């Protein structure tokens, strides 16, 4: 038997128009059980579960029109298992796998058309293994390999027409030999198609972060630290 202070309590908050904004349950001031947040139009924004203040089990977030935005699973308040995000048109955006909160295994990023944009491999949260990026026309944009989050082996970047743009070899993150760059001003390397993001080694990290920028409602839909303290 729970004492009065140990009973699970339901809390519902409303927006200025009287629509339900958030429905949650707490036990001893910590989130416990089902949690649901809503858009102003009544559609569910996110639906997940808590145990002792931490996220636990399956979780789903949605766009305002009801389309699924993200699907994931949590264990001990950390992402664990498959994570899939979607564009508003319903196409998959990202497919990832987590182990105890860290990326592990293959990461795949797609264009809105459903074509593959990027494939990477992770181990214990670090880049480890081959990776490859594509232009929208299907041409390889860049490829290489990482070992323990450091470049290792051959790196090649291409123009959209398939000609080599950059080429280099790395060992344990350090350049070995010359870094070769082939000028776009060479008529053979020009392409009259629409411009896309440049592919250079210097831009690579920013491109990777941009490609993975998903509005992760699972991380930002509430201040969980405050919730756990019962504020």
Language-model-detected regions and their locations in the chain:
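Periodic aromatic/glycine/histidine/acidic cluster detector
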Residues: 1-134, 139-157, 163-231
């Amino acid at each position: 038997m729970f004492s009065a202070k140990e009973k699970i309590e339901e809390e519902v908050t409303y927006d200025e128009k009287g629509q339900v904004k958030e429905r949650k349950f707490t036990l001893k001031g910590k989130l416990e059980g089902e949690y649901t947040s809503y858009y102003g139009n009544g559609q569910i924004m996110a639906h997940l579960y808590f145990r002792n203040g931490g996220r636990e089990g399956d979780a789903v977030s949605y766009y305002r029109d009801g389309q699924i935005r993200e699907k994931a699973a949590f264990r001990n308040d950390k992402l664990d298992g498959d994570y899939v995000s979607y564009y508003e048109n319903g196409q998959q955006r990202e497919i990832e796998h987590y182990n105890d909160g860290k990326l592990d295994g293959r990461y795949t990023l797609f264009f809105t058309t459903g074509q593959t944009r990027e494939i990477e491999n992770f181990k214990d949260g670090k880049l480890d293994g081959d990776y490859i990026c594509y232009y929208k026309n299907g041409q390889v944009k860049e490829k290489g390999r990482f070992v323990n989050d450091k470049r290792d082996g051959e790196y090649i970047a291409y123009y959209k027409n398939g000609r080599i743009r950059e080429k280099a070899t790395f060992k344990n993150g350090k350049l070995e030999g010359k870094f070769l760059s082939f000028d776009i001003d060479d008529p053979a390397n020009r392409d009259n198609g629409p411009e896309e993001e440049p592919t250079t080694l210097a831009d690579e990290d920013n491109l990777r972060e941009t490609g993975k920028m998903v509005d992760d409602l699972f991380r930002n839909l509430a201040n969980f630290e405050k919730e756990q303290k019962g504020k």
